[in-house]
Amino acid sequence: MSSKKVIKTSNAPDPVGPYNQAIKAGDFIYCSGQIAIDPALNEITCLGDIEKETIQVLKNLAEVLKAGGAKIEDVIKTTIYLTDLRNFQIVNKIYSDFFNIENTPARACVEVSSLPKGVLVEIDCVAFLD
């Protein structure tokens, strides 16, 4: 029987709704969507700048993964939510710099009408610990 554990760290922003930063279930870590909130300030300092937002989102995800005992190389699936698919190539560039190209996870990218706090990008992920 697998166990379920809440993952929480002060090195990533608190959730903006009634959910946890991540849940570890067995050998998997399910990270909730991260937006570009700077955890040190608990605010968005780069609103409207897709490059800076994406970098902050990926940093936040890395911190949540670390709190769960995982690293970015353990990510097996991501979902990217964009308010404008014209930002797709910019996000791809930053994303490819962040993930090892030989070990990039499976991924979906979808356009949505809006995201919390008016951000341009949100990313969630699933990691596998072996």
Task: Identify the meaning behind each predicted range.
Residues 2-130:
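Short, polar/acidic, helix-capping and beta-turn segments at strand->helix junctions
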